[in-house]
Amino acid sequence: MAVSSEQHELSHFKRTQTKKEKFNCSEYGNRSCPENERSLGVRVAMYSFMAGSIFITIFGNLAMIISISYFKQLHTPTNFLILSMAITDFLLGFTIMPYSMIRSVENCWYFGLTFCKIYYSFDLMLSITSIFHLCSVAIDRFYAICYPLLYSTKITIPVIKRLLLLCWSVPGAFAFGVVFSEAYADGIEGYDILVACSSSCPVMFNKLWGTTLFMAGFFTPGSMMVGIYGKIFAVSRKHAHAINNLRENQNNQVKKDKKAAKTLGIVIGVFLLCWFPCFFTILLDPFLNFSTPVVLFDALTWFGYFNSTCNPLIYGFFYPWFRRALKYILLGKIFSSCFHNTILCMQKESE
């Protein structure tokens, strides 16, 4: 989720703000890009790192999308949630991260103000949508592990459809509504002239909307995930203590629950590690008079993006079915007739 890279200019714009609708931008460079102070070596290194992250995000999530869509054995409620999350992360990597890479390295926005709003709306929507999907997966695993007898009646395809509708519609309405109304900038002195004269894609949140974004986009879903994981972890430990008294099929269920709890714990841990610094900075920045350094904002933004890079790597590491599906994709076997009925895993591996 990109944030503005023009905080250091805002204080200067405040001192020269006028009530006129048109601004004389001559002293601000007439929207021309400032000279890039980074050396060629630094820029090449930044492009290489960011391009690598984009490559993994796009093709890792694309492999997940193809795997779940193609192989019938993977058509389960849980995997439909993972499929939708992979689509979200794929779109973030394909449509947002390349523009963010150019802006971050060149310290300039080349694509105009109208596209800036469209870009930032999708950036904000996809980032929050990805987070909402992680929360939905946690809810799914909560019922599967803590209430296994009720799972098939509670987590049905219609329920998954409603969850997915919520995951996409709420972030979309929030992002496009806030960005195109420019409500996020109400009360920020100098913002109008910053938009009119700067060479960036300036989006910065005031105290109200910075707090709202932090609470709705991070704190609430994050708290839900941590609480759910705590309950799952407690139940899996309780099951593990009774492992010696169980039959083999029950023993396998306990092992599956333990693995699911471990995987979910890693997913939540990576989410908190990647997104907390970015959201916390957005929350604090308006209270600090927008004094956060540009380089720090860019670094935290890419740290958040990295969550979408990590998701397919986590599932690929912990789920054998994904590794087998990826192998078949790379070998081109999915183009064979009826190969979609291939058994990728035993039932105990499929969840």
From Swiss-Prot:
Glycans are attached at N24, N30, N289. Residues 1-48, 101-118, 184-207, 285-299 are extracellular. Not expressed in the pons, thalamus, hypothalamus, hippocampus, caudate, putamen, frontal cortex, basal forebrain, midbrain or liver. GO terms for biological process: G protein-coupled receptor signaling pathway. It is found in: Cell membrane. GO terms for molecular function: G protein-coupled receptor activity; trace-amine receptor activity. Keywords: Cell membrane, Disulfide bond, G-protein coupled receptor, Glycoprotein, Membrane, Receptor, Transducer, Transmembrane, Transmembrane helix. The chain crosses the membrane at residues 49-69, 80-100, 119-139, 163-183, 208-228, 264-284, 300-322. Residues 70-79, 140-162, 229-263, 323-351 are cytoplasmic. It comes from the Eukaryota. GO terms for cellular component: plasma membrane. Pfam families: 7tm_1. Disulfide bonds join C33-C197, C116-C201. It is a multi-pass membrane protein. InterPro entries: GPCR_Rhodpsn, GPCR_Rhodpsn_7TM, TAAR, TAAR_fam. The keyword Transmembrane applies. Belongs to the G-protein coupled receptor 1 family. Orphan olfactory receptor specific for trace amines. Trace amine compounds are enriched in animal body fluids and act on trace amine-associated receptors (TAARs) to elicit both intraspecific and interspecific innate behaviors. Ligand-binding causes a conformation change that triggers signaling via the G(s)-class of G-proteins which activate adenylate cyclase. In addition to the well known disulfide bond common to G-protein coupled receptor 1 family, trace amine-associated receptors (TAARs) contain an unique disulfide bond (Cys-33-Cys-197) connecting the N-terminus to the extracellular Loop 2 (ECL2), which is required for agonist-induced receptor activation. This is Trace amine-associated receptor 2. It comes from Homo sapiens. The gene is TAAR2.
